[in-house]
Regions:
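Juxtamembrane "helix-exit" motif on the non-cytosolic side of transmembrane helices
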Residues: 2-3, 57-66, 124-133, 187-192, ...
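Short, strongly hydrophobic alpha-helical membrane anchors
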Residues: 1-12
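Membrane-interface helix/loop boundary segments of multi-pass membrane proteins
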Residues: 153-179, 219-223
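Alpha-helical transmembrane segments in multi-pass membrane proteins
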Residues: 10-21, 37-90, 112, 140-142, ...
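Functionally important transmembrane alpha-helices
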Residues: 176, 199-259
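Juxtamembrane helix-entry segments on the extracytoplasmic side of multipass membrane proteins
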Residues: 8, 132-144, 191-206, 252
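C-terminal membrane module of polytopic membrane proteins
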Residues: 24-29, 230-287
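Small-polar-interrupted transmembrane alpha-helices in polytopic inner-membrane proteins
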Residues: 147, 172-187
Length: 287
């Protein structure tokens, strides 16, 4: 077993160090996305890097706060800033419809709602076993507000902008790259006070698997709204059961069960993409 102090290296960094590191990473991302017309992968990596750096920088700002009342509002900045950034990107590129904000008449493959809803089985079981954690209306309201902004930011970034930026790649590659970046985006949780590296690694791994299913459904159904709704329901059940959706180290049985279920759903997602040319994705004609 390693030295406990070593596992707290990143969470224990001074807030200025976290803030500075985050700004440097975000600045590197800006350099990557400058030539927006050259290389979709570079643009996607740039968006990912900007988001990751911004989250780390804001974690530094939050860590610097004291016990003033406004400190409890600071976590909203953690997701509001990258959410506003990604909304600005969509507006600048006129991509809102292309990334899945489509009218109901353009939705496809409604039967894929079934595998999408299967992702909720584990959190439903967990919530049923633990029950709803007692809390106040104010705290729950703040948690739900944070959650909704966070879901918008994550889904629009990884099932929206990143997938669209990678259109030059095969559909399978687009989904896998997007899912991998989605998983890696959770590494900023290493900077949380008391962060468990094993829990963060587990969250990254499972997020990649979930991201495959979400990406496949997003492209096949030609809508991002349903994916956002299911993602929000997933995280809300974690909040109701545990009081938060932060990464924790799983038990071995829990890890095996979650991995088997999510791996099966990820494989199902990849099977969804094995369609004849012209029927896999409805984005091409929207360009």
């Amino acid at each position: 077993m390693g030295d406990p102090a070593s596992t707290q290296l990143l969470p224990g960094l001074d807030w200025l160090v976290k803030f500075g590191f985050g700004l440097i990473v975000a600045a590197a991302g800006l350099l990557l996305i400058r030539p927006t017309r050259r290389g979709g992968l570079r643009f996607a990596l740039g968006v990912f890097t900007i988001e990751a750096g911004t989250l780390v920088a804001i974690r530094g700002i939050v860590a610097a706060g004291s016990s003033h009342w406004w400190q409890y509002l600071m976590p909203f900045a953690l997701v509001l800033v990258p959410a506003l950034f990604i909304a600005a990107v969509l507006t600048r590129l006129h991509w809102w419809r292309r990334v899945g904000f489509t009218p109901l008449r353009e939705w496809r493959a409604p039967h894929l709602v079934v595998p999408l809803l299967l992702i909720l089985v584990l959190p439903i079981v967990g919530l049923s076993a633990r029950g709803v954690l007692q809390t106040t209306v104010l705290v729950l309201g703040l948690q739900i507000g944070f959650l909704l902004i966070d879901i918008f930011m994550e889904e629009v970034t990884y099932r929206g902008v990143v997938l669209e930026a990678l259109r030059a790649f095969s559909i399978g590659s687009r989904v896998m790259i997007s899912a991998t970046l989605f998983g890696l985006s959770h590494l900023d949780n290493l900077f949380l006070p008391g962060a468990d590296p094993v829990g963060v690694a587990y969250q990254v791994f499972e997020a990649v698997l979930v991201g495959v299913l979400f990406g496949a459904v997003r492209l096949r159904m030609n809508t991002i709204g349903l994916v956002m709704a299911v993602h929000a329901a997933y995280d809300l059940m974690l909040v109701l059961a545990f009081g938060h959706a932060l990464p924790v180290a799983p038990t071995l049985p829990g890890f095996i069960l979650a991995t088997v279920v999510n791996l099966a759903l990820a494989m199902l997602g990849l099977l969804m993409l094995r369609r004849p040319p012209g029927t896999a994705v409805g984005l091409q004609k929207v360009a």
